[in-house]
Every structure is written in C-alpha cells, then in structure tokens.
Design a protein with these regions (language model features):
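Non-catalytic alpha-helical scaffolds and adjoining flexible linkers that form interface surfaces
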Residues: 1-239
C-alpha cells in the first residue's frame, strides 16, 4: 500500500530503532519503524522525515499492527526552504508538535490532510513577513477545521471575548477566562486572517507572543492541553 504522510515527530525506541509519528492521507495518524544508527541509509531516512516533511512510502498496514514498516521512501513534494531556513525549521518543529498533540486518534480525514499539506507548502515558500505570522494563522485555521472556531457573529464593538464559551459578550463572565476589550477586538480580527493576507497583520514580538498564548489557552480549554510544548520557548525568542 502506498502512503502519503506528513512527518510529525521521531522518538528513539531502542539503539537500533526510531519510531516516527506521522499523519497520513490514507490512514490518519500512523507510526513507522525507522533504523537508528549512523549509517548512510539511517541518515537518509532521518533527513527525509524531518518535521513537516511531505513523504510517500510503501507499507503493509494490517489489523492490530500499531507500528508499520516503510520502504521505497521518497519526498512526495520537495521542500526548498523548510529545513534550511532556521526560522522555518523552528516553526515546523512547533507546528509538528502541536499536530502530534491534536491529531491523536481517528481514521483518515482527507480534508484535514489537504489543509496540512497546503499549509506546509505555503510555509516553505513564505517570505519573512509571511513567516512571522504563519504559526498564528495556521493555529486559527486549524481550530476552524477542528470545529472550535469562536462564534465571530457575536462580536460587537466594545464586547469581551469569553474564552470558555467562544463568544463575545458585553459584560464580563463570572470566571476569569476572558479577554479585555482591546484583546477581544484583536481576537475578532484574527478571524479575518488567511494565508493570503497574513503578511498584512503587523505585530511586534510581545504582541505576537501574547496572541500565541491566547490561542494555545483556547485550544487547551476546548480541545487538548497545549501546556507542555517543548518548542514553544524557542519559538517565542525567534519571532
């Protein structure tokens, strides 16, 4: 069976084996066994399966088999800058870590796969202004695909964003998970951000990190905890 997948994370399983977690078009979340070590074939395999690599391979999925073999491994779509530009490398690590947390179970979802593949290609070809906001745009649109997008129809000028309800309201809720007026306006503006216009949104590092914190908290409330992302601190320092 030919599988097309996006590499997410590699974990050392033993001295001779690495487990690659990936998201495939055909099966959804999958795990592959890769050779560890310092040989040419192992090094080539690791290069092909760096975070967010777009890969095609032959495999033999069977009922009850949790870790799949892989052979005839090739890049399905060559990526020019994603693994050579240090900023894009860091964003790729962060996005892959988020996806490994979010895409835990379930079968194939071709719409999700196509969204992810398109996003990876956009990041690979992005200029510096687009790259700076890519992770914010990606997370918002990922939330939309996961069904947790805030109800933007509830926004009115001066309203406050209730993080728990995912709605805007004119009075503060009884809990503390809500945004002030200025941040609530910004949360509404994010709903208008697309990969095509993300370069037009101007934020400094402090603003960008505050937005990122807010989105990750929203994911933690509505989907899965984002409080243990190892790549987050490095990402904050770069963008």
């Amino acid at each position: 069976v030919n599988l097309h997948f996006i590499a997410l994370k590699a974990t050392k399983h033993s001295d001779s084996q690495i487990i690659l977690t990936a998201y495939s078009r055909e099966l959804g979340r999958v795990a592959f066994a890769l050779p560890a070590g310092t040989g040419k074939s192992a090094a080539r395999m690791r290069a092909l399966t760096m975070p967010l690599s777009l890969v095609e391979c032959a495999s033999d999925p069977r009922p009850g088999r949790e870790i799949l073999p892989m052979r005839q491994v090739v890049q399905s779509i060559p990526l020019v800058e994603l693994h050579s530009d240090p900023f894009k490398q860091m964003i790729a690590m962060f996005v892959a870590e988020v996806l490994a947390a979010v895409l835990q179970s379930g079968g194939a979802d071709e719409g999700m796969y196509e969204f992810l593949e398109a996003a990876v290609r956009i990041l690979d070809g992005a200029d510096s202004r687009q790259t700076a906001n890519f992770h914010i745009c990606f997370l918002y649109n990922l939330g939309r695909r996961l069904g947790i997008e805030p109800d933007v129809s509830t926004y009115t000028q001066g309203s406050l964003f209730d993080m728990e309800d995912g709605t805007w309201r004119m009075t503060a809720p009884l809990h503390r998970r809500y945004l002030g007026e200025e941040a609530s306006l910004l949360a509404w503006r994010l709903s208008r951000m697309t990969f095509a216009n993300m370069h037009r949104f101007r934020f400094n590092r402090m603003e960008r990190n505050a937005i990122l914190d807010g989105i990750l908290e929203y994911f933690s409330i509505h989907y899965v905890s984002m409080r243990r992302l190892h790549s987050l601190d490095i990402l904050r320092s770069l963008l």
